[in-house]
């Protein structure tokens, strides 16, 4: 067992019990009002929800209010009909996107993403289809790598590639793992949407960021100091010991402890 701050009083079963309680505390509809997951909840059509979810997750770094506001701007720029916009847009429809900016994600990146999404729906059976085609039983990280290759089969600027992380290149791929959690987990708790039925939640990886990483280290379930792909594999292994069928539910506990409780 890992050496940890709480080891003297908390074994793995006690830790699981503690984190299970925190999952129940944070994995409920109250979580949505301050989280970007609210963006895909605005839509009922699967394709609409998965498109805006992907875009919202892509810009999910920085201030959460700013993320949510800018994601809503993206929805407005797509005429509040994202799937229709992606599939039927002409070049001149992309011009209003030019002034969009969130941190380093700009209007040119946004336009490229629209074109890439159309390519995926036309030629690769949609977003779920790409990930399902390349999934492995115990990990979606190789599927993320393949998704990035497919996504950038269209003409694009090299700078735009940085907005889709690649775990096989060492990234923890926090934002895309968060997006996959939204799309795949379906526990009827009202937060994650569970729209994708062809991929098991058992294959998901935790969206590892500064909050979840720091809490995991304090709990002794993560030793590596960098938040990278190796740290993610280490954390995933520990979370699967507590629940192999739904390991990423513990993201709610780790994130909630870090953000809301200052753990």
Regions found by a protein language model. Name each.
Residues 2-263:
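HhH-family (HhH-GPD) DNA N-glycosylase catalytic core used in base-excision repair
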């Amino acid at each position: 067992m890992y050496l940890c701050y709480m080891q003297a009083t908390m074994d793995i079963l006690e830790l699981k019990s503690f984190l299970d309680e925190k999952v129940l505390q944070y994995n409920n509809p109250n979580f949505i009002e301050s989280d970007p997951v609210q963006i895909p909840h605005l839509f009922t059509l699967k394709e609409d929800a998965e498109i805006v979810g992907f875009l919202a997750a892509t810009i999910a770094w920085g201030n959460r209010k700013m993320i949510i506001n800018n994601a809503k701007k993206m929805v407005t720029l797509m005429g509040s009909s994202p799937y229709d916009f992606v599939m039927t847009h002409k070049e001149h429809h992309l011009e209003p996107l030019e002034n969009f900016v969130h941190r380093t994600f700009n209007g040119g990146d946004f336009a490229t993403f629209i074109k890439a999404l159309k390519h995926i729906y036309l030629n690769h059976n949609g977003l779920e289809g790409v990930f399902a085609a390349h999934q492995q039983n115990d990990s979606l990280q190789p599927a993320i790598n393949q998704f990035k290759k497919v996504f950038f089969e269209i003409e694009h600027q090299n700078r735009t590639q940085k907005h889709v992380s690649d775990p096989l290149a060492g990234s923890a791929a926090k934002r895309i793992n968060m997006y996959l959690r939204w799309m795949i987990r379906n526990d009827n708790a009202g937060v994650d949407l569970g729209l994708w039925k062809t991929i098991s939640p058992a294959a998901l990886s935790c969206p590892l960021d500064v909050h979840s990483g720091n809490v995991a280290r304090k709990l002794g379930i993560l030793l590596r100091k960098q938040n990278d792909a190796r740290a993610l594999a280490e954390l995933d292994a520990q979370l699967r010991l507590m629940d192999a069928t739904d390991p990423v539910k513990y993201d709610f506990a780790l994130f909630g402890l870090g953000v809301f409780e200052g753990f």
